[in-house]
Regions:
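Acidic/glycine-enriched edge-of-secondary-structure segments
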Residues: 2-8, 89-96, 216-220
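Short, contiguous acidic/charged loop-to-helix segments that flank catalytic cores in large enzymes
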Residues: 4-11, 37, 153-157, 172-174, ...
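A conditional alpha-helix N-cap/helix-loop micro-motif detector
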Residues: 9-13, 102, 161, 225-226
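C-terminal accessory regions
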Residues: 26-28, 162, 167-266
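Short, well-ordered beta-to-alpha junction loops that form the rim of enzyme active sites
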Residues: 32, 125-128, 249-250
C-alpha cells in the first residue's frame, strides 16, 4: 500500500490505508514489514500504529510459512537478512548450496527444471537495466552472463514460461510467486565486513533507483533504503520450496558463504 502520492498509479492522496479505512466497514490487513521494496510504499510500525489509531484493531500473528520447505533454512535466511552469516543447514529434504561461480549453479537450475519444473535464476537489482527500451541488459555471475527478464505481456507468470529459463528474474518478476528451486545471484550491493563478521550494504551499487524515490516524511531515509535492499533479498531467498542455491558477486562475501556452507557439513 502506498504511503505517498503516486501519479503513475493514479493515487494522489497521502496514504492508501487512510482512504480504505474511511470507506470500509471492515478491513482485513495482512502485513509483512519485510516485503516492502520501495520508499513510496515503505511502512514502519509507528506509521501503521498512527494510521490505525482511533479504530478498533485486533492483531493476529502468523507464525508458519508454507513456501521454504525447511524450517532451519528459513531461520538461516532470517539471520542472514539481519546481517549474520551462520553455518548453512543441510537438511535431507531441502537442497541448500553455495557456488563459487554462476555457471554450475545455472546448469543445476536447468537440471532441476527438467526434473520438476519451476526452477529459475533470480537476482538482486544490482545490474543496470531500463524497463521500456528494447536493449538487452545482462546479469553476470562469475563466468555466467544471462539477460534480465523482459516485460511480460502474456497472462502466464514469468516462471511458467519455458523461455525464461534462459533469463534472470527480478524482485518484480518473482514476488508473490513460488518456485521449486531458486538460484539467487547476490549482486555487488551486498558485501562483507570480516572484522565484524557482518553483511554490508553499498547503496550506490543498487540499480533500482525507482525504489529510492524521495520520501520527505521519513526521518531516516538511509536506514529505510538499507531495509529495502534487505527486504528484496529476503523475498528472493524465500521463493523456493525444495532447494536454494547462492552465488555472491562480492569476493569476500562469496568466500564467507562458501566457508559457512562447509561449516554446516561438519
Amino acid at each position: 500500500m502506498l504511503t505517498a502520492p503516486d501519479p503513475y498509479n493514479n493515487f494522489r492522496d497521502a496514504n492508501q490505508l487512510t482512504d480504505i479505512l474511511q470507506l470500509a466497514r471492515l478491513v482485513v490487513l495482512v502485513f509483512d514489514f519485510h516485503q516492502l521494496v520501495k520508499l513510496k510504499s515503505f511502512w514502519t510500525p509507528a506509521l501503521l500504529k498512527r494510521i490505525t489509531a482511533g479504530y478498533p484493531v485486533a492483531h493476529f500473528q502468523l507464525t508458519e510459512q508454507m513456501r521454504v520447505g525447511d524450517a532451519a533454512v528459513s531461520n538461516w535466511i532470517d539471520q542472514f537478512v539481519r546481517g549474520r552469516i551462520t553455518p548453512l543447514p543441510h537438511p535431507e529434504k531441502f537442497d541448500f548450496r553455495v557456488f563459487a561461480d554462476g555457471q554450475p549453479m545455472y546448469r543445476l537450475i536447468q537440471q532441476r527444471d527438467a526434473e520438476v519444473g519451476l526452477s529459475r535464476l533470480i537476482a538482486t537489482a544490482d545490474y543496470p537495466f531500463t524497463v521500456l527500451d528494447k536493449k538487452t541488459w545482462y546479469v553476470t555471475a562469475g563466468s555466467l552472463r544471462l539477460p534480465w527478464d523482459k516485460i511480460n505481456f502474456t497472462d502466464r507468470p514469468w516462471a511458467q514460461r519455458p523461455e525464461t529459463l534462459h533469463e534472470v528474474g527480478s524482485i518484480y518478476t518473482i514476488q508473490g510467486f513460488d518456485l521449486n528451486y531458486a538460484g539467487v545471484i547476490l549482486g555487488p550491493s551486498l558485501g562483507y565486513n570480516a572484522e565484524k563478521d557482518r553483511l554490508t550494504v553499498n547503496l550506490s551499487q543498487y540499480q533500482d533507483k525507482e525504489a529510492f524515490k524521495k520520501r520527505p516524511d521519513l526521518a531516516d531515509t538511509q536506514a529505510a533504503k538499507i531495509a529495502i535492499v534487505m527486504n528484496a533479498i529476503n523475498i528472493l531467498l524465500k521463493r523456493a520450496k525444495y532447494g536454494l542455491y547462492l552465488y555472491a558477486a562480492d569476493p569476500a562475501l562469496r568466500q564467507r558463504l562458501l566457508q559457512a556452507h562447509d561449516l554446516g557439513r561438519e
